[in-house]
Curated annotation (Swiss-Prot):
Protein name: DNA replication complex GINS protein PSF1
GO cellular component: GINS complex
Species of the source: Yarrowia lipolytica (strain CLIB 122 / E 150) (Yeast)
Gene: PSF1
Family: Belongs to the GINS1/PSF1 family.
Pfam families for the chain: PSF1_C (PF24997), Sld5 (PF05916)
Any one of the GO BP annotations: DNA strand elongation involved in mitotic DNA replication
Keyword Nucleus: yes
Keywords: DNA replication, Nucleus
């Protein structure tokens, strides 16, 4: 039935929103949707090129309208799937996290986007453009160490960050470690 493959892509996009990691690219589904779009386009062109085609014929007009709307719906579903993946890759690039399930084209896109971020951040070395846009609620926070880091020198002294230990520290002192996943805010 028309649109079933595209609907699977939409379901995959919704499922992706709830996952921590981006799932593998659904290449077969994408190819299926593209194939369906080409078939619908060919069918529309064939109908319009027939010698007995009458644009005033309501049945033919309705048939063309349904095929055209199905083609547009497939395109929207495909674009929504691609946009969801691109948005997640952009977020990963800004957060400097790794996405392991990217295909070749997505890896190229991610690399180019990361290079663009480096170019943007280049002249502003004193400003952390990857930081959150929302101001912190508290200057000091409780953190739990997820991975042993060792000794960390801060403005207020030295912390020995061993796994499963907890500290009450300034957010600015441990922000990088939070982003890297060594610490978790409690």
């Amino acid at each position: 039935m028309l649109g079933d493959t595209a609907l699977k892509l939409v379901h995959d996009s919704r499922r992706t929103a709830a996952l921590d990691l981006l799932p593998a690219y659904q290449e077969e589904l994408v190819r299926g949707v593209c194939r369906e779009i080409r078939q619908l386009d060919a069918s529309i062109n064939k109908t319009q090129d027939e010698p007995g085609y009458d644009p005033q014929d309501r049945v033919a007009h309705c048939n063309l309208l349904v095929q055209h709307l199905a083609m547009r719906r497939d395109k929207r579903c495909l674009l929504a799937y691609q946009f969801t993946r691109a948005r997640r890759m952009n977020e990963a690039a800004w957060k400097q996290t790794e996405e392991p399930n990217l295909n070749g084209n997505e890896q190229e896109y991610m690399k180019a986007y990361e290079d663009l971020i480096v170019d943007i951040k280049g002249p502003y070395t004193d400003i952390d453009l990857t930081g959150s846009l929302e101001p912190p609620n508290d200057v000091f926070i409780d953190v739990r160490v997820l991975q042993s880091v060792g000794e960390v020198q801060t403005e207020y002294g030295v912390f020995n960050l061993e796994k499963d230990s907890q500290f009450f520290v300034r957010r600015s002192d441990v922000q990088t470690l939070l982003l890297q996943g060594y610490l978790k805010e409690i």
